Amino acid sequence: MRTFWIVAMLLVGVEGSLVELGKMILQETGKNPITSYGIYGCNCGVGSRHKPKDGTDRCCFVHKCCYKKLTDCDPKMDGYTYSFKDKTIICDVNNPCLKEMCECDKAVAICLRENLDTYNKKYKIYPKFLCKKPDTC
């Protein structure tokens, strides 16, 4: 179980509800979020924002920027619930900040699906030291 949580920390969003984010990514892309996106490119997983390597990596960059805009909640600590109906993610959360967090996660899951054609296996376990200088949102 401890190994699962260590690996789970490598997910795209590290912050927020890792389980919910992982489920969204799996539902939208059909890919395992940990093995496919956990250490992908320069922006998926742990670390700061860098110049994206491709469309998939850009999704993770935008997701980190989305989390940066959150107010009144902590993406590292707070969680949420959502539903998945008719192949659609529904953020049915009453708390405004948790709803924003859910919407950030929904957006990255959809973005990853829309960028499946940009997914490049050479970026799957990409060394961060090869990433260009940090980029701003």
Swiss-Prot record:
Residues annotated as site: Important residue of the cationic membrane-docking site (MDoS): K121, K124
Record site feature (Cationic membrane-docking site (MDoS)), residues: K128, K133
Organism field: Crotalus atrox (Western diamondback rattlesnake)
Gene3D superfamilies tied to this protein: Phospholipase A2 domain
Location within or outside the cell: Secreted
Tissue: Expressed by the venom gland.
Function comment: Snake venom phospholipase A2 homolog that lacks enzymatic activity. Displays edema-inducing activities and may be myotoxic. A model of myotoxic mechanism has been proposed: an apo Lys49-PLA2 is activated by the entrance of a hydrophobic molecule (e.g. fatty acid) at the hydrophobic channel of the protein leading to a reorientation of a monomer.
Residues under site feature: Hydrophobic membrane-disruption site (MDiS): L130
Primary site of residence: secreted
Source domain of life: Eukaryota
Family: Belongs to the phospholipase A2 family. Group II subfamily. K49 sub-subfamily.
Subunit: Homodimer; non-covalently linked.
Signal sequence, renumbered to the chain: 1-16
SS bonds (residue pairs): C42-C131, C44-C60, C59-C111, C65-C137, C66-C104, C73-C97, C91-C102
Positions of region (Important for membrane-damaging activities in eukaryotes and bacteria): 121-133
Stored PROSITE patterns: PA2_ASP, PA2_HIS
Protein name per the record: Basic phospholipase A2 homolog Cax-K49
Keyword Secreted annotated: yes
Keyword terms of this UniProt record: Disulfide bond, Myotoxin, Secreted, Signal, Toxin
GO CC list: extracellular region
SMART domains: PA2c
